[in-house]
Regions:
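Core catalytic lobe of class I
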Residues: 1-279, 283-292
Length: 292
């Protein structure tokens, strides 16, 4: 891993093209009074991210509901293609003044256009696909049997079952025992069968006693996004790494990591957290590198 203190636009300009497999970041939301938080990252910053990502690489950026449009436009104007929007449900936030209770944070999901066909791009650059099958959301109970609300058992068209009168009854496919297909909602929703990956806000224990960063994301959340959008043994860029949660998650998932932050204070915290994670990873997985 590498943690760098500096302006991310300046730092990235020293890198060559097509370096990273993915960018997963939690940048300033443009909602504060400080100089670094008076606006969302500029098009020029995202252009440097675009330049250093491999063709087909994904760029995920957290943002506020109020300025999602501005973040998405800047990312798109840098050359990315907007592919999706993920909603992280954050139901523990408290309402402020005369407003609705904040309950989610959106994530812009964008992709650097791939070269030629998706298969050829993946063969050449090692990215462009997302890993959904290995990141299914596990059933809370036994996989549902029979038809359940929400379509856990799907009708299949083109494979005919029996015919009753003039109506055709088609076959069905049972629910996948490994869980539901991951969705673009991350959070907790009441259900007989868990529909979404659950990622509560980071606890004080997870942050560390000396971590005073105001918007620390949970490690499980970042690890989940990395597993889906960054190939195994790939590299993750975080140009606004803060206290290093993305780096810790990347190391847990056996990905390379480069983090950049303007604050020397937070890069020191990020370096310390990643160092602890590195030692823990080596102790728990002494033969990890030999398995690949």
């Amino acid at each position: 891993y590498s943690i760098i203190n500096g302006n991310c636009q300046d730092v990235l300009s020293t890198y060559g093209e097509n370096i990273f497999h993915s960018c997963i970041t939690d940048p300033p939301y443009g909602m504060g009074m400080d100089d670094w938080d008076h606006s969302v990252p500029t098009v020029e910053i995202w252009q440097e991210v675009y330049r250093t990502l491999k063709p087909g690489g994904f760029c995920l950026s957290f943002c506020s509901p109020e300025l999602y449009h501005r973040m998405a436009v800047n990312v798109e104007d840098a050359g990315f293609v907007i592919k999706d929007q993920i909603m992280w449900m954050t139901t523990t936030k408290m309402p402020k003044h005369n407003r609705l209770k904040p309950a989610h944070e959106p994530i812009v999901v964008a992709q650097k256009p791939y070269e030629g066909s998706l298969k050829n791009n993946h063969d050449k650059w090692g990215c462009g696909l997302i890993d959904t099958d290995n990141n299914r959301v596990a059933w809370e109970k036994e996989p549902p049997k029979g038809w359940v609300k929400g379509g856990a058992k799907r009708r299949t068209f083109g494979r005919e079952g029996k015919t009753t009168g003039s109506q055709k009854e088609f076959g069905t496919v049972d629910a996948n025992p490994n869980g539901r297909y991951p969705s673009n909602i991350i959070g907790s929703v009441q259900s007989d069968h868990q529909k979404y990956f659950y990622a509560p806000r980071a606890t004080r224990k997870e942050k560390g006693k000396d971590n005073d960063h105001p918007t620390v994301k949970p490690i499980d959340l970042m690890a989940y996004l990395i597993r889906i959008y960054c190939p195994i043994k790939g590299s993750v860029l975080d140009p606004f790494c803060g206290s290093g949660t993305t780096g810790v998650a990347a190391m847990r998932e056996d990905r390379e990591f480069v983090g950049i932050d303007l604050s020397k204070h937070y890069t020191e915290i990020a370096t310390q957290r990643c160092s602890v994670e590195e030692v823990s990873h080596l102790v728990l997985n002494p033969l990890a590198d030999m398995l690949y």
